[in-house]
Curated annotation (Swiss-Prot):
SUPFAM superfamilies: Aldolase
Record's GO cellular component terms: cytosol
Role this protein plays: Catalyzes an early step in the biosynthesis of tetrapyrroles. Binds two molecules of 5-aminolevulinate per subunit, each at a distinct site, and catalyzes their condensation to form porphobilinogen.
Record-given protein name: Delta-aminolevulinic acid dehydratase
Gene source species: Streptomyces coelicolor (strain ATCC BAA-471 / A3(2) / M145)
Active-site residues annotated for this sequence: K203 (schiff-base intermediate with substrate), K255 (schiff-base intermediate with substrate)
Subunit-level organization: Homooctamer.
Length: 330
């Protein structure tokens, strides 16, 4: 007599027999609308500048950034997250280029909004690290430590100028205590109630950021372990989530993605707002480097990595492959 609850009656391989069978029963599907494209725009360049540590990624000119945004729209990507790279001479201790209405990030926001309108969610990184001469995500006190509350005042200014420049969404990435509430209040005070906040809720002090530091021309000396999270900790991410939601976050994010899928799953289970994850520069570069050596199948590895992030609970994924993968999926 056949026993159907176990072998030989139960044969899970039946659902793996053909590509169409596997496709039909797949629990997780990637879609172009899942993706957000991170993009760097550099001040004072006439040609895109390749980023050596991130093969295939560039620091855009204003014109090539507009082209990249248009291509993202055509591919069905949902959003673009902009990072500004100012000229070195414009960096200072307070990161004033980050709040200059004519600074590179604000100019780029206006450019992209003029190019794509509301066809693409235009997002802006809200942090000081690209604009400070010390490379930290905030202003420093007399002892050289990041001053949390003084930094919040700068973040409020940044939020307002980014919203005025056309950002649909601001992404506070500095991991300062209280940043979401301060930014929400600052936006509401100038009538920007419709501008959403994507909170970098669980952002870890990770070695995988290495290539990104080149991408934004970071001046950082030391580390960010006094404000970004310790990679050994999981429960504090849920505390950060509760605080961000209480302060008014519209969406939340886990960063990095791949090494922190357990955190992503916990946050996704606990959150009542959309959850994003950022597949960061080191994740990107590892796959590209291994594929260049012929050690892995590049295209399969990209899709597998993104599927794993979505399977763990991400509604949206920031990835440097956003446009490429979206085209593949269409």
């Amino acid at each position: 007599m056949t026993t159907y609850g176990s072998f030989p009656g139960a044969r899970p391989r039946r659902l793996r027999t053909t590509p169409v069978m596997r496709r039909m029963v797949a629990e997780t599907r990637l879609h172009p609308a899942d993706f957000i494209l991170p993009a760097f725009v550099r001040e004072g360049v006439s040609e895109p500048v390749p980023i050596a540590a991130m093969p295939g990624v560039v620091q855009h000119t204003r014109d090539t950034l507009k082209k990249a945004a248009a291509e993202a729209v055509e591919a069905g990507v949902s959003g673009i997250m902009l990072f500004g790279v100012p000229e070195d001479g414009k960096k200072d201790a307070a990161g004033t280029a980050g709040t200059d209405p004519d600074g590179i990030l604000q100019v780029a926001l206006r450019d992209v909004r003029a190019e794509v309108g509301d066809e693409l969610l235009v997002m802006s990184d809200l942090c000081l690290d690209e604009f400070t001469d010390h490379g930290h995500c905030g202003v420093l006190d007399g002892q050289g430590r990041v001053d949390n509350d003084a930094t919040l005042e700068r973040y409020a200014e940044m939020a307002q100028v980014q919203a005025d420049a056309g950002a649909h969404v601001v992404g506070p990435s500095g991991m300062m205590d209280g940043q979401i509430g301060v930014i929400r209040d600052a936006l509401d005070q100038i009538g920007r109630e419709d501008v959403a906040i994507l909170a970098y809720t669980a952002k870890y002090a990770s070695a995988f950021y290495g290539p990104f530091r080149e991408a934004v021309g970071s001046s950082l000396k030391g580390d960010r372990k006094t404000y970004q999270q310790d990679s050994a900790n999981a429960r504090e991410s849920l505390r950060e989530l509760a605080l961000d939601l209480e302060e008014g976050a519209d969406m939340v994010m886990v960063k990095p993605a791949g090494p922190y899928l357990d955190i992503l799953a916990k946050v996704a289970e606990a959150s009542d707002v959309p959850v994003a994850a950022y597949q960061i520069s080191g994740e990107y570069s590892m796959i590209e480097a291994a594929a260049e050596k012929g050690w892995i199948d590049r295209d399969r590895a990209i899709l597998e990595s993104l599927t794993g992030i979505k399977r763990a609970g991400a509604r949206n994924i920031l990835t440097y492959w956003a446009t490429e993968v979206a085209r593949t999926l269409r």
